[in-house]
């Protein structure tokens, strides 16, 4: 028996060296030739037209539990029973038990070749050899992942200051007296004109004039015009009287006039004739103090946001108001401000994994929906993540031999053909299951449900958060449905539809809600978002009224499944696959070899 064991090992090594590389290359070439044929040929295939005697519901359908079934149901039990009791099983068992034993001769040529391979193993597959060299090769592969996240939204309030006056007003009388002959006069168009600048502003409540008789003995009549009022003057007579002026008011700094002719007959005046004018003016007396009034403009409820920045938009300094001819001035350090509020904080959402991975880079992003004010609230982001594959090869002359199972991946790249094919088949199977369950005229597949969450006026109570639920105390106010929706979002079962104001008072929004379409599986979410919306451009409705209807059969046939990205489904697929443990396989091979050696020694 000890002599036979090296022979068996030599046999295995010889066969592995001689055939592994050629068989592997042949299989790899064949796989690349038929790549993609399965998924393209299955689309639009009608089995009843191509398969004679096709039956859509054979008896064997009782063993099929759907793509989500955990096992094969009764198929295993029925198979075991048939093997033990059926004629076919009995025949196979008897043939196996009565089969003559194979006696291996130590002198067989293939055993001798195997021994030779064992003796030269290090030079064949090791890192040594006269004409061979071991090399490391590596390859980078980039995979795109799409995720969703909230963006930070900033809104602004403005505060503007204006200067106003406060105080009281009283009235007093002022008496103004003038002697016209003592004032400078100018000759204008044959008239002597005296201009008098008023020192006050007010209403003339009494006007009085007077003059004395002159030295002239003859009568010299003329007209003196004062404040627009004509007065009759004569050199032979004196006068002392009141009059009602045409001009009723005086303005500080503004002149009024008195005038008469330069020559009357043969008499020529050298200046304005003597005349006293007395005016009693009612003047307003005010006592004012300047102060500042602030006005604010805010298109949203400040309770919905957090103040992050305040900046001055109109520089400070002195400003002046003039009232009743009097100037009032005051100083302000800033006359207008702009306050910045964050009304929505950024949330990494389902992008957390990729933003934390240094091998992932943001390649594109697109706004999913906007606020009523036009700000982007939510976006779809695409990250490209790099993964490196390395392997060890032996280069002998012009031939390259793979020393481990990774070198072909490093040379040609890892392929997701299997995962992609299984995902497409699973999507079609799931759609078929939905259709079969309805049996109606208006058949739909992958139907979802409209879900809502609220963003309360308290600011910190955001029940629409995509992450950080365990650390936010404000989330205690969220309902169980909102918490379930958050779980569905983390499992990538939702499609974001929009956001709207659900409670508004006096034009200010106090509460907002966000709407989603929630589906039962990742496959449904992928087909709905990428197929229905992405390819067919069918909307999910408005924020207030989401349209989460299923996909019709006609729409399903128009979707190109080979263009759908099933990356999110791959994770579940790979996590749920059952691959035998390598240690178990090794032990099983050892047991089989031991059994063969025992039989050979008998």
Swiss-Prot record:
Pfam families: F_T4SS_TraN (PF06986). Residues 1-18 form the signal peptide. InterPro entries: TraN_Ftype. Changing residue 147 to S: 1.7% conjugation efficiency. Disruption phenotype: Greatly decreased conjugtive transfer. Essential for F plasmid conjugative transfer. May interact with the recipient cell surface to stabilize mating pairs initiated by F-pili. May interact with TraG. Transfer requires OmpA and lipopolysaccharide (LPS), which are possibly receptors for TraN. It is found in: Cell outer membrane. Has higher gel mobility under non-reducing conditions, suggesting it has disulfide bonds; a dsbA deletion mutant has considerably less TraN that is still localized in the outer membrane. The first 350 residues are required for recognition of OmpA. GO terms for cellular component: cell outer membrane. This is Mating pair stabilization protein TraN. The lineage of its organism: Bacteria, Pseudomonadati, Pseudomonadota, Gammaproteobacteria, Enterobacterales. Keywords: Cell outer membrane, Conjugation, Disulfide bond, Membrane, Plasmid, Signal. Interacts with OmpA of recipient cells. Might form multimers. May interact with TraG.
């Amino acid at each position: 028996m000890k002599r036979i064991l090296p022979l068996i090992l030599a046999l295995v090594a010889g066969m592995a060296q001689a055939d592994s590389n050629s068989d592997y290359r042949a299989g790899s070439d064949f796989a690349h030739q038929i790549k993609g044929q399965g998924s393209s040929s299955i689309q639009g295939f009608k089995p009843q037209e191509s398969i004679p005697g096709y039956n859509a519901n054979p008896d064997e359908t009782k063993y099929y539990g759907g793509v989500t079934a955990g096992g094969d149901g009764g198929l295993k039990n029925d198979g075991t029973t048939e093997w033990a009791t059926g004629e076919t099983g009995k025949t196979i068992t008897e043939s196996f038990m009565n089969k003559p034993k194979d006696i291996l001769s130590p002198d067989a040529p293939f055993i001798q070749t195997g021994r030779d391979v064992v003796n030269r193993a290090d030079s064949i597959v090791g890192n040594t050899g006269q004409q061979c060299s071991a090399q490391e090769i590596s390859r980078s592969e980039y995979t795109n992942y799409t995720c969703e996240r909230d963006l930070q939204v900033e809104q602004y309030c403005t505060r503007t200051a204006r200067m106003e006056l406060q105080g009281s007003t009283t009235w007093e009388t002022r008496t103004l007296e003038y002697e016209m002959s003592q004032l400078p006069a100018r000759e204008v168009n044959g008239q002597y004109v005296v201009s008098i600048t008023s020192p006050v502003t007010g209403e003339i409540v009494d006007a009085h004039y007077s003059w004395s008789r002159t030295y002239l003995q003859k009568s010299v009549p003329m007209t003196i015009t004062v404040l627009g009022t004509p007065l009759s003057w004569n050199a032979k007579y004196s006068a002392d009287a009141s009059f009602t002026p045409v001009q009723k008011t005086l303005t500080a700094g503004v002149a009024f006039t008195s005038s008469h002719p330069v020559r009357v007959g043969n008499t020529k005046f050298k200046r304005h004739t003597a005349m006293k004018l007395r005016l009693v003016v009612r003047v307003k007396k005010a006592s004012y103090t300047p102060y500042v009034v602030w006005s604010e403009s805010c298109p949203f409820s400040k309770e919905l946001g957090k103040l992050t920045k305040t900046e001055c938009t109109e520089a400070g300094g002195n400003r002046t108001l003039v009232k009743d001819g009097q100037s009032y001035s005051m100083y302000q350090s800033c006359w207008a401000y702009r306050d910045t509020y964050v009304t929505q904080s950024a949330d990494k959402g389902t992008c957390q994994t990729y933003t934390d991975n240094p091998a992932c880079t943001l390649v594109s992003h697109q706004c999913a929906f906007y606020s009523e004010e036009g700000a982007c609230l939510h976006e779809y982001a695409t990250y490209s993540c790099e993964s490196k594959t390395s392997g060890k090869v032996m280069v002998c002359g012009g031939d390259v031999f793979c020393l481990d199972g990774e070198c072909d991946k490093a040379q040609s790249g890892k392929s997701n053909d299997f995962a992609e094919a299984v995902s497409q088949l699973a999507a079609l199977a799931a759609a078929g299951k939905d259709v079969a369950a309805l049996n109606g005229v208006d058949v739909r597949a992958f139907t979802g449900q409209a879900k809502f969450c609220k963003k309360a006026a308290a600011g910190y109570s955001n029940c629409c958060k995509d992450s950080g639920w365990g650390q936010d105390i404000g989330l205690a106010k969220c309902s169980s449905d909102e918490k379930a929706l958050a779980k569905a979002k983390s499992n990538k079962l939702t499609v974001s539809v929009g956001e709207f104001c659900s409670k508004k008072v006096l034009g200010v929004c106090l509460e907002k809600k966000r709407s989603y379409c929630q589906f039962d599986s990742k496959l449904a979410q992928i087909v709905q978002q990428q197929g229905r919306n992405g390819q067919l451009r069918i909307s999910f409705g408005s924020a207030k009224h989401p349209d989460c209807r299923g996909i019709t059969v006609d729409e399903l046939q128009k979707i190109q499944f080979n263009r759908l990205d099933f990356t999110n489904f791959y994770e579940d697929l790979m996590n749920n696959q059952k691959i035998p443990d390598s240690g178990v396989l090794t032990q099983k091979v050892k047991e089989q070899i031991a059994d063969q050696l025992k039989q050979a020694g008998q």
